[in-house]
Amino acid sequence: MVARVQYSLIVFVSLAFAQESIQTFSMKAAIQYALTHSPSLQNTYLDYQIARQKIAEVRSAGLPQINSTTTLRYFVEIPTSLVPGEFFGAPRGTFIPIRFGVPYNLEIGVTGTQLLFDGTYFVGLSATRAVKELTYRAYQRSRIETITAVSKAYLTVLITQERLRLLKENLDQLQTTLRQTKGLYEAGFAEKLDYQRLEVAYNNLQTEYNKAAELTALAYLTLKLQMGYPLDQPIALSDTLPELPLLLPDSLSLQNFDPAQRLEYQILLAQRRALELNLRRYQVAYLPSLVFISSLATQAQRNEFDFFDTKKRWFPIAFIGFQLQVPLFDGLRKASQVSQARLELLKNQNDLYQLRQALTLEAQNARIQLLNALQNLAIQKRNLELAQTVLETTQKKVEAGLASTVESVQAQNAYQQAQLGYTTALLEAHSVYIDWQKALGLLSEPE
């Protein structure tokens, strides 16, 4: 009775939610939603966008740099210059201090520079493109991780729902048996002990049902979390459990497995390209740099602050030129930077080798785990079929008076355990199948 009330409550709540237009998701739709709304995935995409803007930032250094400057000077003490005394009739070798200038000086101008040659600039621009590729690979890996997490969470909900459905069927069947046994007991055709045994079995099954209902609710929350969906809003699933493809040992061969298909390996390769360009950047830092410089300004000098007097003159100033910078000695700083960059490349080479070995081992382990999971699933499915046959036969014998309630309870428990074993094996097989696809680099976005 408790199970029926609880199930009715679930149906009532479901209908209430349905009136609020519950959003229904297929697995494909759930994955697409997660790829758009997952906060962690959005952050990796923002990292990619930041890398793109970094390229624009570095590129801007090679474009003309134009600035406007305004300089106002007030000389509290006008600068003094020493003029040879013979200009004023003084003895040769003497100097006379004379102040030149006026207190107020205002200069307004525009300066411009253009980088003509700098080896570090061109290499740095290529390096930022490599960093952009690196962040894009990381973004792709995050998408695969999101697909994996959502797929597993979706399947977990389907399987926990299936287990809940099976438990509900068991409860209904056991409740019917319990009611019939109670009638037989009251009529004097069954012992009280038989009825009590069935009641204990029913209560235990009710407890399992309650636990399964809580696990189903938790599975829904986990799915919504992986999707980036609001936890306080209900959802419904439209897909059913997919059939696992029949995979034989030959079809699980790793003969054509290539670690380079994995995004983790591609990320390290992109990192290597960035490190190579970083080394090149330090090496070309020994080359000179050449910059074109120019300035155009106008200047006014006044005894008083009357720069807005249009009747007084302003004097133009203009120049163009080149600035050549040749590195001579920096205390071996660039030599140390080159050595560090080479060592980073060696580390990357070791990382590539280690990752190749690790990915190969992961693929082999995924193959073994999948084979074992499929074998276990076949066994558990057969056990479930046998347990169901035993239960149906035992129930018929009990109705005919050829078997006791003890045998009925035992058959019911065996069937319940077989159901649990089957659903657990089913979840494991689906989860391991996803891991196998990921290990071989076969997991992709739904079309």
Which residues does each PLM region occupy?
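Small/polar, glycine/serine/threonine/aspartate-rich low-complexity segments that form flexible
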Residues: 20-22, 69-110, 240-248, 293-326, ...
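Periplasmic alpha-helical coiled-coil/stalk elements that build and connect Gram-negative outer-membrane
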Residues: 29, 53, 145-259, 369, ...
